[in-house]
């Protein structure tokens, strides 16, 4: 650039002169993306049937329930049964008030 005013010739640069190895990329390449249905099928975690045996929270009679759950869900359910959740048998359920003691 010579002088006080900038000319277009001073600004326009040829890309090939600066980096001859740079080539334009075709964004419509031959790559095939999976359909949305295939993606959702792959993302679903595997479920397994489990038999859960736990004592009633009041009378301690053995209760059995059957669930279909993921590994994460059955571990979470197990932790709840050990810590904060108690299942009740039909007889004890009648003796308790809903939502309270």
Swiss-Prot record:
Subcellular location as annotated: Host cytoplasm; Host nucleus
Region feature E7 terminal domain, mapped onto this chain: 1-44
GO terms assigned for molecular function: DNA binding; DNA-binding transcription factor activity; protein domain specific binding; zinc ion binding
One BP term from GO: symbiont-mediated suppression of host type I interferon-mediated signaling pathway
Keyword terms, alphabetized: Activator, DNA-binding, Early protein, G1/S host cell cycle checkpoint dysregulation by virus, Host cytoplasm, Host nucleus, Host-virus interaction, Inhibition of host innate immune response by virus, Inhibition of host interferon signaling pathway by virus, Interferon antiviral system evasion, Metal-binding, Modulation of host cell cycle by virus, Oncogene, Transcription, Transcription regulation, Viral immunoevasion, Zinc, Zinc-finger
Pfam families in the record: E7
Zinc fingers typed unnamed, residue spans: 56-92
Primary location recorded for the protein, binned into one broad class: host cell
GO cellular component: host cell cytoplasm; host cell nucleus
Residue positions of motif LXCXE motif: 27-31
Posttranslational mods: Highly phosphorylated.
SUBUNIT field: Homodimer. Homooligomer. Interacts with host RB1; this interaction induces dissociation of RB1-E2F1 complex thereby disrupting RB1 activity. Interacts with host EP300; this interaction represses EP300 transcriptional activity. Interacts with protein E2; this interaction inhibits E7 oncogenic activity. Interacts with host TMEM173/STING; this interaction impairs the ability of TMEM173/STING to sense cytosolic DNA and promote the production of type I interferon (IFN-alpha and IFN-beta).
Function: Plays a role in viral genome replication by driving entry of quiescent cells into the cell cycle. Stimulation of progression from G1 to S phase allows the virus to efficiently use the cellular DNA replicating machinery to achieve viral genome replication. E7 protein has both transforming and trans-activating activities. Induces the disassembly of the E2F1 transcription factor from RB1, with subsequent transcriptional activation of E2F1-regulated S-phase genes. Interferes with host histone deacetylation mediated by HDAC1 and HDAC2, leading to transcription activation.
Family, as annotated: Belongs to the papillomaviridae E7 protein family.
Domain notes: The E7 terminal domain is an intrinsically disordered domain, whose flexibility and conformational transitions confer target adaptability to the oncoprotein. It allows adaptation to a variety of protein targets and exposes the PEST degradation sequence that regulates its turnover in the cell.
Protein name, entry field: Protein E7
Organism field: Human papillomavirus 21
Higher taxonomy: Viruses, Monodnaviria, Shotokuvirae, Cossaviricota, Papovaviricetes
Primary gene name: E7
